Amino acid sequence: MIKNITGIAMSGGVDSTATAILQKQKGPVLGFFMKLNQPDYETQRDRVSQIAQKLDIKLEIIDLTEEFQEYVLKYFSASYFKGLTPNPCIICNKEIKFGLFQQAILRQGVERIATGHYAQIHKTAAGYQLHKGVDPHKDQSYFLSRLSQEQLAHSIFPLGGMHKGAIYDLVEAHGFHDFRGTESQDVCFLEQDNVVDFLEQTAEFSASSGNIVMNDGKILGKHKGLHRYTVGQRRGLGISYPVPLYVINLDVKNNNVIVGENEQLFHKTMAISDIHWISQPEREDLLHASVHIRSTHKGAQASVILKENNRASVIFDEPQRAITPGQFATIYKDTQVLGSGVIL
């Protein structure tokens, strides 16, 4: 392994461009770009190539199309087929960006890889800790909650201690004036976030209509497939009722969308499975922590009762709205990510 060479994960966005600028100031770098299932792959590739050329960075393209299909797309479709709401970004980070992509870069003789994520890594005597980025509006630590110690050991997050405004100032100072007002987007297989169109390209979702029902079994209407709905959804139900109704559950066994009033979305308890710890908690039976039930959730204080087989029961201090099976619950101690589990 060649010392002091940093790999840069480049996507063509403002964050990866700022990362490249910062790391190049510190020493030699190599740029890397992932080919996945991007709808606009050629446009994105050309954009990355232009940025790399302007910064005088050698760029290599790593094709992970088949692997992305296997690890991310299959998980995404299978989750909806089971009536779950997946988070493909978390799986992509674990298996692709910080998994196969990172491994491919390390084989090039690179020691560490810098990405444009808004998070921080702290090295301690006990290992590597993952912390929130200092910009609360851009923090991405939730999406990194499945990373391993080894993955963190080879990662650098130069933007974790910065705010977004400073990022724009930095790239503009280096001649990039077309980023202001734009946001970096994760490399994604969904064009314009059209989940339904993507899912209905697969046979499983071709003939899956069923009933929209109340908890007591009263039928209010028909749905066009469970994959079109998620817990907490109000729009697009196509039903009439004296008060607003929301999706409160997806009954896969009977192919029903169960709806109810807003207060029925609030719960104090949930179960999580497949817990992955970045940093082991001090106790093996119980911990008090802030738990985030989705990426946009601000977090809520809870008691996490640890059980066998990487499972836990979570009891919130206050009821939480729209706890959604399939999403990840990320466990924080102050700014530190301890780990995460899948909501059952």
Swiss-Prot record:
Claim: Transferase is one of the keywords in the record: yes
EC number from the UniProt entry: 2.8.1.13
UniProt keyword list: ATP-binding, Cytoplasm, Disulfide bond, Nucleotide-binding, RNA-binding, Transferase, tRNA processing, tRNA-binding
Chief location: cytoplasm
InterPro entries per the UniProt record, alphabetical: MnmA-like, MnmA-like_C, MnmA-like_central, MnmA-like_central_sf, Rossmann-like_a/b/a_fold
Domain of life: Bacteria
Stored CDD domains: MnmA_TRMU-like
Gene Ontology cellular component terms for the protein in this record: cytoplasm
Site (described: Interaction with tRNA): H117, Q327
Transmembrane feature ranges: none
Pfam families: tRNA_Me_trans, tRNA_Me_trans_C, tRNA_Me_trans_M
Localization of this protein: Cytoplasm
Record: active site: C92 (nucleophile), C188 (cysteine persulfide intermediate)
Interaction with tRNA: region residues: 138-140
Disulfide bonds listed in the record: C92-C188
Gene Ontology annotations of biological process type: tRNA wobble position uridine thiolation
Positions bound to ATP: A9, M10, S11, G12, G13, V14, D15, S16, M34, G116
One MF term in the entry's GO annotations: ATP binding
Record has Transmembrane helix as a keyword: no
HAMAP family per the UniProt record, alphabetical: tRNA_thiouridyl_MnmA (MF_00144)
Membership in a protein family: Belongs to the MnmA/TRMU family.
NCBIfam families per record: PRK00143.1, trmU
Name of the protein this chain belongs to: tRNA-specific 2-thiouridylase MnmA
Name of the encoding gene: mnmA
